[in-house]
From Swiss-Prot:
Keyword Transcription assigned: yes
Protein name per the record: DNA-directed RNA polymerase subunit beta
Organism taxonomic ancestry: Bacteria, Pseudomonadati, Thermodesulfobacteriota, Desulfuromonadia, Geobacterales
The species this protein was found in: Geobacter metallireducens (strain ATCC 53774 / DSM 7210 / GS-15)
Chain's role: DNA-dependent RNA polymerase catalyzes the transcription of DNA into RNA using the four ribonucleoside triphosphates as substrates.
InterPro entries assigned: DNA-dir_RNA_pol_bsu_ext_1_sf, DNA-dir_RNA_pol_bsu_external_1, DNA-dir_RNA_pol_su2, DNA-dir_RNAP_su2_dom, DNA-dir_RNAP_su2_hyb_sf, RNA_pol_bsu_bac, RNA_pol_bsu_CS, RNA_pol_bsu_protrusion
Any one Gene Ontology BP term: DNA-templated transcription
GN (gene name): rpoB
Length: 1370
């Protein structure tokens, strides 16, 4: 068994106690799936779902003109191929986008003026170009104007209905006022709210409030219908003086008896007077058949009639609906002989009179009046007509064009109110509004619950696809207006669809979204982890979201529903804390935009293998066990009572009541947090810093994967897309630093493919953060790779695992005060070995433009410069690759024509003699800015189409063409070899039916002779189809088919090659006015130095304070010096003990490595090495793997482990203290992991033993080189004439008011005068100073500071006549 990389992952000693149930979903699927659903690019037009782009087109089209005689209908859309590929877009500063065409149909109608019947006159169909739409790259990013960007998903409030109360803060009485709000996806908001008098009001779009019954009446309800909808009625019967009410079990439960209730047959008293109607009492009544309950007259007085009470004889209305029944009215009812009537059941305890009170306040009686009242509120000042009022009201909530609840909104509305409206009804219905009010009244009456806005069932994620869909809709609506206007202005029958459609507004909106939206962000490309995290980020900010200032504490806080969905740890420190979050490791987003997390299904106390995803609403009410709950071999819970979560609480639940179980302990944290070993032993604040700082780790020159990891490193490296992953299974044909060629196994490739995979690696490219992206092969020729194997490492990856820092030997002890306040003392060995050296790449651009005075020119012929300055430029004026540059050096020579100046007679003479070229240009070359020192690693030249190419451009083109040609030849060679192999297997050994001659007429294969390999080799491949075989069924056909396929594949390869070469030689699209553009790339090597920021993974950060010679570092008894000394005081108060456990486990890992190294040095027998390794790993699969290796392979494995045995301690189920002790023991160390150290300077042992171990330490992107800055002379501000500030402007240090006081306190008068005048804003003094320095005098003549003039001018601008009187002192 060849030792391949695939085995590398087995070599991590994993301490996980829980078996992996499901794989972590691809980490960037959230981006890719969303955009896929939006574009539906691989789905044929007729099969596309009504979602994404398709839904936008369908919702805006058809567009009709104002007179309804023509309509423009949408048929389908199609996407072309992008003009440039990803790499070219990067280089040329282009957008990676595909052209879009939309097929539309223009239908023109004829309308018969007499009958009004419409008939089709004309139908025209046409494909119209619809601008470009950016495409997503393989890695879930977009390339916009040459830079890689990420669209961050937005977490916003879900559409639907929300109930809330003011917690008693609105009114002084402290009364709790309830409110309801219907939020659509787009359209008007609808708010219902109670005031302190219990009257229900409504607001439309947050306008002035009006009684809610106005809205309900506008829906077509009368006051009587409303009362009977919201209130139950009681039937009252009259017979002479006797009065009774019908027994209604539901209403009786809240009432008392007024007199004894007697069974009329037996005379038995069933319920005594003044007793409550209990359930038992009501049951007893029913058994005795009692349906009427006697009541007294005073019980009816004060009730309200639920319908008009009418005299049957005369038709006169005695009591109107909603009118209070008084004793007089009751007497009249009796007198008129009315035997029964209905009253509303309102007891003001369980049923309040708020809706009835609202009807009394509301002075509007009819639907028409209600509509006009609403119109007046929304459009004050407009004279209302019934028609316009009705149209306005219908458009508000019932018109799909103006109002859209979306499927999610409808789902939430149905869920909350228990409705059964179909999901495709996405406007409000009459029933919706009535039910919203009913639920609100119930809330007031003490039934139902208010909503928690921070619950993840009420917040949903808008990913890329949906955000872009909304932008597209905005663009199309703008376009729709223009189309309607064009239709009405011109004769439609003479137009084609393309005359009507102008796609500019749509393109503009999309461009603006990608270029400047708050959610379209410059990708954080510092290292692979920062890329993955950026794509998995959720932001509550952005258009339609919250703002930093308005977001309160609740929104930012961790919520129980975040468990397994949103990480409680990873969020920025500062004003955005809690508003920007990260998806948890296993979380995904469902079709409605809710975040889901997987759980194992538990049935009858047994955990099944089934895994299902649940959203926050779906998991509500389920009892969920934790992933580490103890189970036996059958998957049954060991303990009777298990710790579980239910409705946001942690409870002890009986095992039979459990329904779900977490899939993994790391389910609740994000990717970055899951990379921190022993996270469970860290304080949350420090873990937050740790997960954030890992994203700032700079990729180092020598990547080194962590000895103590968590097992997530491989997943992150693979999903981030920085390493190269094999597309098919096959054998490595050739490998060099910049490409890998893999011949695909025959059973893998399809007929359309070529059978060859060529992987061109990225070499020393620049990332968005100027770090270096470089890929290195990890396979050898002849290796067999499987689909999905890592074949080349990218930045910060080591053998396919994420490697952000270095494993270093640390000691926790003070050392001469150099680790005061978190400072870090490091050994010079780390800088010598380039352990923390990183490469940074800067890009510089020089543009030659066509100016008013003439064309700028890129050339090496620059006036007034010596040979020495120009020695590294080639004849085109561009610096050669490999040149070492320092600040001020010229990278690209450029001259610009000067304006015409008055020439002196001498200059005129010189011009006459030497021609005009001498003095009319100035040097505007591109120079290296201050603080940059490095090596030129590349230059690219872009010139306008039709311009002559210079020699440098031609050379670059030649090199590129060579590369392409090499790829083409390799592909052809491999597929030809593969075809020849197939043909030989078919033909060799068969009998020839005809003789075959070579081109000289010599017989190579005789008739009836056996065909041999040598004979075949002598015939050119294209003549093999002449060979005929006797008795071989279908062999000739197979040969012909293989040769035809081969030719076809070769043609495809050649076509692709020619196309690429043609693209290469074509001129470039440059911005207007630009003739030529040159980009120069400089690689800067940054060694670790004093002032650089470093950090561990546990939020333990510090700044390098001193680099100590190796011999001065504290050393162990065997003479090994430590590499870093940290302050032990940094641990206890910060409570990030995880770093100590990591140090101990790392020490054990390192010690085991040293033991293996010792064995190898002593040439111990392989059996001894194997036995030791099996003792270290102690797992069955590892032992079996080690047994399967031969001696050479075992030695190779051992050599790999010399630097230390990698361990994985997954979060929340990591190594226990016993396991760490056992590992230390196997490494031959003391259990305390403390060592006697000796002072490197004196050789004396330190007084106490010191904790020593191996920690994984990162170098962060805050490098001192980028921050340190000094200025002697530089630019000044235009108005104040003071030096600018900041490194970017090459500014000075600010000397403020307090610094002036300090100078005054020391009495440093002359120094202070200098600071405030010539070094700041004294223009005349500066000039005199310059003269004095040139003449060698060292005197100071300060003048008047410019700020004084500014002050005078400001006072004059206030119309104060201020002037400075200058004169002699007397």
């Amino acid at each position: 068994m060849a030792y391949s990389i695939a085995n590398n992952q087995l070599l991590r000693q994993n301490f996980a106690k829980i078996k992996k149930i499901i794989d972590i979903p691809n980490l960037i699927d959230i981006q890719k799936n969303s955009y896929k659903r939006f574009l539906q690019i691989d789905t044929p037009p007729e099969a596309r779902k009504n979602s994404g782009l398709e839904a936008v087109f369908k919702s805006v089209f058809p567009i009709k003109d104002f007179s309804d005689t023509a309509s423009l209908e949408y048929v389908s859309y199609s996407l072309g191929t992008p003009k440039y590929d990803v790499e070219e877009c990067h280089q040329r500063g282009m957008t990676f986008a595909a052209p879009m065409k939309v097929k539309v149909r223009l239908v023109v109608w004829d309308v018969n003026k007499d009958t009004g019947v419409r008939s089709i006159r004309d139908i025209k169909e046409q494909e119209v170009y619809f601008g470009e739409i950016p495409l997503m790259t393989e890695n879930g990013t977009f390339i916009i104007n040459g830079t890689e960007r990420v669209i961050v998903s937005q977490l916003h409030r879900s559409p639907g209905v929300f109930y809330d109360h003011d917690k008693g803060k609105t009114h002084s009485s402290g009364k709790v006022l309830y409110s309801a709000r219907v939020i659509p996806y787009r359209g008007s908001w609808l708010d219902f709210e109670f005031d302190h008098k219990d009257i229900l009001y409504v607001r439309i779009d947050r306008r002035r409030k009006m009684p809610a019954t106005v809205l309900l009446k506008a829906l077509g309800n009368s006051a009587e219908e409303l009362l009977n909808f919201y209130y139950r009625s009681e039937e009252i019967g009259l017979d002479g003086e006797r009065m009774w009410k019908k027994a209604d079990a539901e209403l009786l439960t809240t009432q008392k008896t007024s007199s004894d209730i007697v069974d009329s047959k037996t005379g038995e008293v069933i319920i005594k007077a003044n007793r409550k109607f209990t359930k038992a009492a009501i049951r007893k009544m029913t058994e005795h058949g009692i349906t009427e309950i006697p009541i007294k007259a005073e019980e009816v007085c004060g009730k309200y009639a639920s319908t008009d009470i009418v005299d049957p004889a005369t038709g006169e209305v005695l009591v109107e609906c909603n009118e209070e029944i008084s004793q007089a009215k009751l007497d009249e009812i009796k007198a008129r002989g009315i035997s029964e009537f209905k009253v509303l059941f309102i007891d003001n305890l369980h049923v309040t009179s708020s809706l009835r009170d609202t009807l009394l306040v509301d002075k509007i009686n009819t639907t028409d009046d209600a509509l006009i009242e609403i119109y007046r509120r929304l459009r004050p000042g407009d004279p209302p007509t019934l028609k316009s009022a009705q149209a306005l009201f219908d458009n508000l909530f019932f018109n799909a064009e103006r109002y859209d609840l979306s499927a999610v909104g409808r789902l939430k509305l149905n869920y909350k109110l228990g409705l059964g409206v179909p999901l495709d009804c996405q406007v409000l219905t009459k029933e919706d509004i009535l039910e919203v009010v009913r639920y609100l009244i119930d809330l007031k009456n003490g039934r139902g619950t208010i909503d928690d806005i921070d619950h993840l069932g009420n917040r949903r994620v808008r990913a890329v696809g949906e955000l872009l869909e909304n932008q597209y809709r905005i663009g199309l609506v703008r376009m729709e207006r223009a189309i309607k206007e064009r239709m009405s202005l011109q004769e439609v029958e003479n137009l084609m669809p393309h005359d009507l459609i102008n796609s500019k507004p749509v393109s503009a909106v999309v461009k603006e979204f990608f270029g400047s939206s708050q959610l379209s962000q410059f990708m954080d490309q510092t290292n692979p982890l920062s890329e993955v995290t950026h794509k998995r980020r959720l932001s509550a900010l952005g258009p339609g979201g919250l703002t930093r200032e308005r977001a309160g504490f609740e929104v930012r806080d961790v919520h129980p529903t975040h468990y397994g969905r949103v990480c409680p740890i990873e969020t920025p420190e500062g004003p955005n804390i809690g508003l920007i979050a990260s998806l948890s490791t296993y979380a995904r987003i469902n079709e409605h935009g809710f975040v889901e997390t997987p759980y194992r299904i538990v049935s009858e106390g047994k955990v099944t293998a089934e895994v299902k995803f649940f959203s926050a609403l779906e998991e509500e009410g389920h009892a969920i066990a934790q992933a580490n709950a103890e189970m036996d071999a059958d998957g049954r819970f060991v303990n009777d009572y298990v710790s579980a979560r239910k409705s946001g609480e942690f409870l002890l639940v009986h095992r039979d009541e459990l329904e779900l179980m977490d899939v993994a302990p790391m389910q609740l944290v994000s990717v970055a947090a899951s990379l921190i070993p022993f996270l469970e032993n860290d304080d949350a604040n420090r873990a937050l810093m740790g997960s954030n700082m890992q994203r700032q780790a700079v990729p180092l020159l020598k990547a080194d994967s962590p000895l103590v990891g968590t097992g997530m490193e491989r997943v992150v490296a693979k999903d981030s897309g920085v390493s190269v992953v094999a597309r098919h299974t096959g054998v490595v044909e050739s490998v060099d630093a910049s490409r890998i060629v893999v011949k695909i196994d025959e059973d893998e490739y399809d007929e359309t493919g070529t059978g060859v995979d060529i992987y061109n690696l990225i070499k020393f490219a620049r990332s968005n953060q100027n770090t270096c992206i470089n890929q290195r092969p990890v396979v050898k020729v002849g290796d067999h790779v499987k689909r999905g194997d890592v074949i080349a490492d990218g930045p910060s990856t080591d053998m396919g695992e994420l490697a952000l820092g270095q494993n270093v030997v640390v000691a926790f002890m003070p050392w001469g005060g150099y680790n005061f306040e978190d400072s870090i003392l490091i050994s010079e060995k780390l800088t010598k070995d380039d352990r923390y050296t990183s490469i940074h790449i800067e890009e510089f651009e020089c543009v030659a433009r066509d100016t008013k005075l003439g064309k700028e020119e890129i050339t090496s012929d620059i006036p007034n410069l010596g040979e020495e300055t120009l020695k590294d430029l080639d004849e085109s004026g561009i610096i050669r690759i490999g040149a070492e540059v320092k600040p001020g050096d010229i990278m690209v020579g450029k001259i610009t024509p000067k304006g015409e100046t008055q020439l002196s007679p001498e200059e005129k003479l010189l011009r006459a003699i030497f021609g005009e070229k001498a003095g009319d240009v100035r040097d505007t070359s591109l120079r290296v800015p201050p603080g940059v020192e490095g090596t030129v690693i590349g230059a690219k030249v872009f010139s306008r189409k039709g311009n002559d190419k210079d020699s440098r451009t031609e050379m670059i083109e030649r090199m590129e063409e060579e590369k392409l040609r090499k790829d083409e030849q390799d592909e052809i060679r491999i597929i030809r070899d593969s075809a020849v192999g197939k043909l030989k297997r078919l033909l060799v050994g068969k009998t020839a039916a005809v003789k075959v001659e070579d081109k000289n007429g010599k017989t190579v294969i005789a008739k009836d002779a056996a065909i041999t390999e040598e004979a075949l080799t002598a015939i050119p491949l294209d003549r093999w189809d002449e060979i005929s075989v006797s008795g071989g069924e279908g062999v000739e056909e197979k040969v012909a088919a293989i040769l035809a396929t081969l030719q076809q594949q070769i043609d495809i390869i050649k076509y692709v090659f020619d196309d690429k070469v043609q693209k290469l030689k074509r001129g470039d699209d440059l911005p207007p006015g630009v003739i030529k553009m040159v980009k120069v790339y400089i690689a800067i090597k940054r060694k670790l130095q004093v002032g650089d920021k470093m950090a561990g993974r546990h939020g333990n950060k510090g700044v390098v304070s001193r680099i100590l010679p190796e011999e001065d570092m504290p050393y162990m008894e065997d003479g090994r010096p430590v590499e870093i000394v940290l302050n032990p005081l940094g641990v206890p108060s910060r409570m990030n003990v995880g770093q100590i456990l990591e140090t101990h486990l790392g020490w054990a890992a390192k010690g085991i490595g040293w033991k293996i190294e010792e064995m190898l040095e002593k040439h111990s027998p392989s059996a001894t090495i194997k036995e030791y390794l099996q003792k270290v790993y102690g797992s069955k699969e590892m032992n079996a793997f080690l047994d399967s290796l031969n001696e050479e392979e075992l030695i190779n494995v051992a050599k790999r482990l010399q630097r230390g045995v990698p361990m994985a301690s997954p979060v929340f189920e990591g190594a226990s203290e016993e396991q760490i002790r056992s590992m230390l023991d196997k490494a031959g160390f003391d259990e305390t992991a403390q060592v006697r150290l000796f002072d490197g300077k004196t050789g004396e042992p330190f007084k106490h033993k010191v904790t020593v171990g191996v920690m994984y330490v990162l170098k962060l992107h805050h490098l001192v080189d980028d921050k340190i800055h000094a200025r002697s002379i530089g630019p000044y501000s235009l108005v104040t004439q003071q030096p600018l500030g900041g490194k970017a402007q090459f500014g000075g240090q600010r000397l403020g008011e307090m610094e002036v006081w300090a100078m005054e306190a020391y009495g440093a008068a002359y120094a202070l005068q200098e600071f405030l005048t010539v070094k700041s804003d004294d223009v005349a003094g500066r000039t005199r100073m310059y003269e004095a320095i040139v003449k060698g005098k060292h005197t100071l003549e300060p003048g008047l500071p410019e700020s004084f003039n500014v002050l005078i001018k400001e006072l004059q601008s206030l119309c104060l006549d201020v002037e400075l009187l200058e004169g002699d002192e007397d």
